[in-house]
Amino acid sequence: MKKCWFHSMLSNVELEYRCRLSKSMDNLGPLENTSVSEDPILNDTEKNTYNWSHSDSSNVDHLVGVRDIRNLNVDDTFLVLGRDNKKDGYSIYFDIENQVFGIDNNHSFLSKLEKEFSSYWNSSYLNKGSRSDDSHYDYSMYDNKYSWNNYINSCIDSYLRSQIGIASSILSGSESYSESYISTYILGESRNSSETGNSRLRTSTNGSDFALRENSNDLGVTQKYKHLWVQCEICYGLNYKKFFKSKMNICEQCGYHLKMSSSDRIELSIDPGTWDPMDEEMFSLDPIDFHSEEEPYKDRIDSYQKKTGLTEAIQTGIGQLNGIPVAIGVMDFQFMGGSMGSVVGEKITRLIEYATNQFLPLILVCASGGARMQEGSLSLMQMAKISSALYDYQSNKKLVYVSILTSPTTGGVTASFGMLGDIIIAEPNAYIAFAGKRVIEQTLNKTVPEGSQAAEFLFHKGLFDPIVPRNLLKGVLSELFQLHAFFPLNHNLSRTLT
């Protein structure tokens, strides 16, 4: 059985994760560090680490950092060492093979941690066992090794997120401390022990970032807090919903661009008071009488209309972008996955024809899972129809079409107007593909490399032009249009002429 240490240290400068070889748990020695000075308090804590009563755990083969923790297997024994903002030392011991868990140096932080653990020990589907009389608990009661391993993983996840939250509060000030505390509390409360998944934890502190792949329980925010917080799907950080829209749906913790509704995107891009929608009353009538054993197509359309307040998966219209008149269409992934049916294709085609006649620059914001299967070949025809209208707009009229690819952009949208822009812009970390990862793997029986369908990877393959963050997008579009001789309206001049 291999024994490992996982070490975490908080300083007032940054959250560090270090690794070093060590022979004895009682004599770790100072840790090498090239970025900040050594912490004598931490070193003293390490040297005086509690000697666990289990004789087979007194020697440690090596010390591992966060980057190496994903290499631990289920038979590893490891200890989590840390120090909170009061510089109190504490350690958490896991022996997965012998199913032992313990906490040393109990204080307020650990009491909260133990309280969280106790809910697992007392859960109805696990058999209770005896506790030792030692200062730490000896839980050797699990007849379900799979359940034990999953829970150990969730404990590590909870610990890492709490440490990162404390570090963020130290770096950004006392105001965010309460927010990170609430974030840790809600994330812990929202843990669902009945489901497991594959999650990615990512953070950045003073330019130092790391990634952790792990199996953990579902960490979705519970319905209880959903009206207050928006949880990032990448780092699981919580963003205050009241300010999330003003932040352009960008996670404050890791900078990930979360999905936006079409209405929010229009508000972000178009000048206030200039938006004039087109074809709002157009909706699908189930042209092929699509048969579904679950929910009829018409009923499904009605439910999405009530849910989103939209009639279809795209909004089209005319507006001004920093004073420049533009024709813009914005797809909405919340409406049936942004799928392209006959109505979506017709609205886009009419928008392109209007922009052609009025000599307006064109913007199409893509967010779609592809062609809508409920409309069969009629949805596939939209690809050719839109491409034909774009040919007249671009080749004959020599006008400028900007395609903006957001996450996700897949299927028939990628294969048609998504990739036909004179300038193709992608959002950071956008998922862009023709066939999705699951479809490729099930069809070809081959594994799709991680990240091979992400915007950053595809950018280096020359698939599109720039990757532009949302907070810079409006300015970039304005400069591009002016470069192509589309200038803001001069309102003073127009008043004089009239």
From Swiss-Prot:
Component of the acetyl coenzyme A carboxylase (ACC) complex. Biotin carboxylase (BC) catalyzes the carboxylation of biotin on its carrier protein (BCCP) and then the CO(2) group is transferred by the transcarboxylase to acetyl-CoA to form malonyl-CoA. It is found in: Plastid, Chloroplast stroma. A zinc finger (C4-type) spans 232-254. InterPro entries: AcCoA_carboxyl_beta, Acetyl_CoA_COase_Trfase_b_su, ClpP/crotonase-like_dom_sf, COA_CT_N. The keyword Transcription regulation does not apply. It comes from the Eukaryota. Its EC number is 2.1.3.15. Keywords: ATP-binding, Chloroplast, Fatty acid biosynthesis, Fatty acid metabolism, Lipid biosynthesis, Lipid metabolism, Metal-binding, Nucleotide-binding, Plastid, Transferase, Zinc, Zinc-finger. This is Acetyl-coenzyme A carboxylase carboxyl transferase subunit beta, chloroplastic. Acetyl-CoA carboxylase is a heterohexamer composed of biotin carboxyl carrier protein, biotin carboxylase and 2 subunits each of ACCase subunit alpha and ACCase plastid-coded subunit beta (accD). Its cofactor is Zn(2+). It comes from Populus trichocarpa (Western balsam poplar).
